[in-house]
Regions:
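Polytopic membrane enzymes that build or remodel cell-surface glycoconjugates and lipids
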Residues: 1-456, 462, 468, 473, ...
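Structural marker of alpha-solenoid helical repeat scaffolds
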Residues: 399, 433, 467, 501, ...
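Alpha-helical adaptor scaffolds
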Residues: 446, 540-582
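Terminal, low-structured helical/coil segments at or just beyond the last alpha-helical repeat
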Residues: 558-562, 570, 577-580, 585, ...
Length: 652
């Protein structure tokens, strides 16, 4: 069932936070030595979550950035979690207090619970959105911790308890929500096995010491502050009480989605309430649900355990700890949904007992098949919204038009698709909704730049810099626009600022160098090329570009055939002498050095490779260059102006 519901996700591209957490995450590029992948970059979804980062490193080792492997592993994790949930529910329904009522039906009831939880559309964000593997993997470890603990309660084998502690430790290093796992194991023992906390600790205090010790792992990871910009108590615009009050209607919304999973939203953009009265109904309703759970835990503890499961697992993200970027997120319901499903399935079983005996089994089986089929279909349909970033953000804006982030990100996707007028409309809407939305100003500037409206773009970038003066991307774009407007001196200042703000970014220096070279600032460009080469010695692009400049610049003062040959040979070595563009540069360098015979030989090799690989445009250029060398003339050409401009902007 899981494969049927998620088979259309295997080609879903990387989205939003996948870029920082996977695509741009250098820590997953190598499995050895392991220290790098165990130290994921800060301010990303994998920050402080080394176990999840290791799984991404394994994916990268097996298939690079091919999304297929990532989605297969995400689905495998989800299916395994459903299987473990099946085991937990079945074992629980066979405990002494429940066996008489549910023991005979434990397996089919557990199967229905697991299937509904597996195919429920509310789970799509945790499975289809690749980087949210942190949620599903944590969920798997959470369930494995409880399953091993349950088996250990009735077994003489110590390995079940050891397994519980081991999985708990892995979960703590996967996501912070795992913090409640030792408490849930303790509560389960008290409610379903031992009958009292005194009896729990009398029988088996040692496993709980081990489980509690895993909090040290979590504390150590949290202490590094990897997401201090997005999670914490120090935000002036997000007080603890306000955040907690906002969670009332949000959690109520989660419960509604559990029963009616429409509409599902990728990014809610839920805003902080401006007045308490606005959230009062939701807060009162959730207070009632919470109070009922507490009372049930006291007077009907087996029922109350479901409420405790729901609220304790949601607590780290949906109570008093402000998460600035997301007040609401569907992936937070990954594990809490299980409590709702168990309650509904067991409740339906109780209702079904009122039917005539001959009707019970077919009615129950029929209802289960219909519900699972409908939920599976809805999940498959929802997964279709993930097929491209443009589709996803279009869907999000349609459902949440007041979400400034969604408006901004839809604008960026439209810009990338060449639909600049539409993109600018959405950027302006994002700014209307949030006048201090710095990324929208920056992104609108890039769209205006692509339309050739450089003066207007500079105005937009200037507003972005007022909001965030240390934004290297904005300085870079301003520099480009000023170059196009003739303000070379001011442009150089902004380029220098962009470089200073990114002291280890070779790409930024390469782009600045290529742009400056295109506008005649050769000395400045040469310096940035050399910095890029020092920062990333095995990257051929800056080496090749500097070689091209030294070989072909129209001003003899900047040409140097000997240096050009040395640089071009290095670029060819880095590309295995198989890249037509580096061979083209080497041929030009030999021609500048006066060795036209070698220039012809290398150019012919480049032409052969380009022809065999269907690079028609490159074939045309190489043919022109080859004709020059055969007539004993060197290549003289200014660097291509348009090439270095990268209108990436800022998404969020």
């Amino acid at each position: 069932m899981g494969v049927l519901a998620y088979v259309n996700t295997f080609t879903v591209p990387f989205l939003l936070d996948d870029n920082a957490g996977i695509v741009e995450n250098d820590s997953i590029r190598h499995l050895w030595p392991p220290g790098r992948m165990l130290s994921p970059p800060g301010q990303t979804t994998v920050a402080g979550r080394p176990v999840a980062n290791v799984t991404f490193a394994v994916n990268y080792a097996l298939g690079g950035l091919n999304v297929l492997g990532y989605h297969i592993l995400n689905l495998a994790i989800h299916v395994l979690a459903a299987l473990v949930l099946f085991g937990i529910v079945r074992l629980t329904l066979r405990t002494p207090g429940l066996e008489n009522a549910y023991g005979a039906a434990a397996s089919p009831l557990a199967l229905v619970v697991a299937l509904i939880w597996l195919v429920h559309p509310l789970q799509t964000e945790s499975v289809t959105y690749v980087v949210q593997r942190v949620e599903s993997l944590m969920g798997l470890f959470y369930l494995l911790t409880l399953y091993c603990a349950i088996r250990g309660f009735t077994s003489e084998r110590v390995w079940w308890s050891v397994g519980a502690v081991a999985f708990c430790a892995l979960g703590m290093a996967t996501k912070e929500v795992m913090v409640s796992a030792p408490l849930m194991v303790l509560l389960y023992d008290r409610v379903f096995v031992s009958g009292s906390f005194r009896e729990v600790f009398r029988r088996r205090w040692k496993p709980y010491v081990g489980l509690a010790a895993t909090w040290v792992i979590l504390a150590a990871l949290v202490a590094t502050g990897p997401r201090i910009r997005t999670v914490g108590f120090e935000f002036k615009d997000m007080a603890v009480l306000d955040y907690a009050l906002a969670q009332g209607p949000i959690v109520l919304h989660y419960l509604r989605l559990a029963f009616w999973p429409q509409p599902l939203v990728f990014d809610y953009g839920w805003v902080m309430p401006q007045a308490t009265v606005g959230v009062a109904p939701g807060v009162l309703a959730m207070t009632g649900v919470f109070a009922a759970s507490v009372l049930a835990l006291v007077f009907r503890p087996r029922l109350g355990f479901l409420g405790a499961w729901f609220f304790l697992i949601l607590a780290p993200s949906s109570s008093v700890l402000p998460i600035r970027t997301e007040l609401a997120a569907e992936h937070r319901m990954y594990l809490p949904l299980a409590a709702v499903v168990v309650l509904v399935v067991v409740g339906c079983r109780r209702v079904g007992l009122s039917l005539p005996r001959s009707w019970r089994r077919p009615a129950g089986a029929g209802l289960a098949v219909v519900v699972v089929a409908l939920l599976g279909y809805a999940t498959r349909e929802r997964n279709g919204d993930y097929r491209s970033p443009l589709v996803m953000w279009t869907d999000t804006v349609a459902k949440q038009p007041d979400n400034f982030r969604a408006q901004n990100n839809l604008g960026s996707e439209l810009k990338d698709a060449g639909r600049l007028d539409e993109a600018i409309t959405h950027y302006r809407e994002a700014i209307r909704l949030k006048p201090d939305c710095q990324p929208a100003y920056c992104n609108m500037g890039t769209a205006l730049t692509l339309r050739g409206e450089y003066a207007e773009a500079v105005d937009s970038f200037a507003r972005a810099l007022l909001l965030k003066p240390d934004d290297d991307i904005t300085h870079y774009h301003v520099g480009y626009c000023l170059l196009r407007l003739g303000g070379t001196a001011e442009a150089v200042k902004h380029f220098r600022q962009a470089a200073a703000l990114t002291p280890t970014d070779a790409r930024r220096r390469q782009d600045i160098a290529a742009m400056l070279a295109g506008y005649g600032e050769v000395e400045e460009a040469t310096g940035y090329y050399r910095e890029a080469m020092q920062l990333k010695p095995d990257w051929p692009e800056p080496v090749n570009n500097l070689a091209w400049l030294r070989a072909t610049h129209p001003d003899a003062h900047f040409r140097n055939g000997v240096e050009a040959v040395a640089l071009a040979k290095r670029a060819c070595e880095l590309t295995g002498y198989k890249a037509p563009w580096t061979l083209d540069t080497l041929a030009a360098a030999h021609a500048e050095a006066g060795d036209f015979a070698e220039a012809v030989r290398v150019a012919e090799k480049a032409l052969e490779i380009a022809s065999s690989s269907g690079q028609d445009e490159m074939v045309k250029v190489l043919g022109e260059h080859l004709a020059l060398y055969r007539s004993r003339r060197p290549c003289r050409e200014r660097p291509e102006e348009a090439k270095p401009y990268r209108a990436g902007g800022v998404r969020r």
